[in-house]
């Protein structure tokens, strides 16, 4: 497997396996990792992760597991057995759920994927949180969940780049994965709390998830190269 030389993760947000692999074939595993989300994973039935790994990609399995502790831990174990590089769970599942996942991965003799907690989705603002009974700012809720993740032994968090400085200050050992990244001049789409790649890295993010600016570009390879150049400045 080629070691990726950048913090970029390209989201393979497609409805079919064929479309996802068509994009993957245009990308260099040395310049990006790839993310497999719910739609692609579900529609592909099985094998998409293994196929991407065989192509040299490190795979972030973005299924945001959230269930009772044992069920979630077994799902994380299954993801590890597929060879994923990173897997995530919802921090709102609680301390016992996250700790169970950590303990299950610790039993493995082989490589362990990074175990990442999802805090507050980047599409959510204060009024969205209020709608589910949380009368708090997104950043305050992120910090609450981050403290739980740290206590549970998680490797990192998914968070907005706007929350990254506070998270790095409070939990410097956690690796921060930031979606909602848009290169300068890109449309915001449905992501609300966004920054450019360079701004996100400067804010403390360790990994950057980019979707449509690359996946929907006329030339995805060129779009990826442009983002790499923007990062390297």
Swiss-Prot record:
Keywords: Decarboxylase, Lyase, Pyrimidine biosynthesis
Uppermost EC category: lyase
List of catalytic residues: 64 (proton donor)
Single Gene Ontology MF annotation: orotidine-5'-phosphate decarboxylase activity
GO cellular component, one term: cytosol
InterPro entries: Aldolase_TIM (IPR013785), OMPdecase (IPR014732), OMPdecase_AS (IPR018089), OMPdecase_bac (IPR047596), OMPdeCOase_dom (IPR001754), RibuloseP-bd_barrel (IPR011060)
Domain of life: Bacteria
Gene3D superfamilies membership: Aldolase class I
Catalyzed chemical reaction(s): orotidine 5'-phosphate + H(+) = UMP + CO2
Pathway: Pyrimidine metabolism; UMP biosynthesis via de novo pathway; UMP from orotate: step 2/2
EC number: 4.1.1.23
GO BP annotations, alphabetical order: 'de novo' pyrimidine nucleobase biosynthetic process; 'de novo' UMP biosynthetic process
Pfam families: OMPdecase
CDD domains associated with the record: OMP_decarboxylase_like (cd04725)
Residues that coordinate or bind substrate: 13, 35, 62-71, 122, 182, 191, 211-212
Family from the record: Belongs to the OMP decarboxylase family. Type 1 subfamily.
Role, per record: Catalyzes the decarboxylation of orotidine 5'-monophosphate (OMP) to uridine 5'-monophosphate (UMP).
Name by which UniProt lists this protein: Orotidine 5'-phosphate decarboxylase
Organism: Pseudomonas putida (strain GB-1)
Originating gene: pyrF
